[in-house]
Amino acid sequence: MIQSRIFAAVVALTISLPALAAEEPAWTQTLERISSGVVSIRVDSTRAFDTEWNTSSQATGFVVDAKRGLILTNRHVVTPGPVIAEAVFRNNEEVELTPVYRDPVHDFGFFRYDPAELRYIEPVELPLAPGGAGIGKEIRVIGNDAGEQLSILAGTIARLDRKAPEYGRGKYNDFNTFYLQAASGTSGGSSGSPVVNIDGEVVALNAGANSSAASSFFLPLDRVERALRKLQNDEPVTRGTLQTTFRSEPYDELRRLGLTEASETLARKRFPSQTGMLTVEQVIPGSPAAGVLSPGDILINVNGELVTEFVALAAILDNNVVHEIAVSVERGGSRIDARIQVEVLHAITPDEY
């Protein structure tokens, strides 16, 4: 038995090695083609209202609209407060950056530079591909890892449904979203790096890492792509909230919380690849959802649609700001229907005093 397993492993390795060797030139061509659009960012920021301390640091960003001079990076790089920043391109040209958007919750934001200031380089735009991430997909993280200006780290996507990483009390922590995870070993300076596939498409945004392991955490691009479209069309990036945090729970835990067999059957049939549904984790006292939703409630329908994951929920909230939505949950096996006002998520973070 052991010999047969060893033989099978050798055969698999023998088959895979030519494929890997064939991919190397393709990766080389891709990385050379897109590297002009990746920049290192130097940041000096004051302490903001929302979790961030004053800092002088380095990070990464990449061009997503060369005509408008839009650079995508992390929220904790743009920061929620006043910031002085500059981008350094591959040929060491420097440009000043102006923050144009920082998401109130998720770890992404946009800077703008003046394209006319660039004299010797025409940076390539890196296309966003939110649907391009998949388990087992080979990726490269390109950025200013460890302050080296341009580093390339390889990895394989292992998870698409990781809970948002927790960096500790009093620090910025994302919520109401899944994260992607891969063992790519990113470190300081790689925040905001593009996570690209072999075609040069950005499938995720590097956001953080586990300092005691090789795990890296990537933000999905669904809401990022929407925000970019809004900015390109000179439209406000509307963001809605129920002032409630949700978490995804597996079906076995949902049954203990009172999920009915009918609801589980419907969810499994409609979304066969998903392994759970959303539950209420916390509700802010005094919010529109207070007294309506309770921790442990299982989210079933929103505006008549079966909602089992974060992207669908965020889309409904963002498109119904200052309007009421119909929400159906199950609590202890009983169904509860209610209407809740969607509030402006941007209004929760103060920006002046």
Indicate where each model-derived feature is located:
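Bacterial N-terminal signal peptides
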Residues: 8-18
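A conserved glycine-rich beta-strand in the N-terminal activation segment of trypsin-fold
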Residues: 22-29, 47-68, 94-96, 122-123, ...
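C-terminal recognition in membrane/secretory proteostasis and scaffolding
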Residues: 29, 67, 75, 98-99, ...
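Active-site region of chymotrypsin-like
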Residues: 37, 54, 114-126, 152-214, ...
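Active-site-proximal beta-strands of protease catalytic cores
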Residues: 37-42, 70-74, 97, 132-145, ...
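Conserved active-site neighborhood of the chymotrypsin/trypsin-like protease fold
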Residues: 46-47, 65-151, 179, 211-213, ...
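Gly/Ser-enriched beta-turn/beta-hairpin loop segments
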Residues: 48-54, 102-106, 162-180, 235-237, ...
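Beta-strand/loop subdomains of soluble extracytoplasmic proteins
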Residues: 83-98, 134-140, 150-166, 222-227, ...
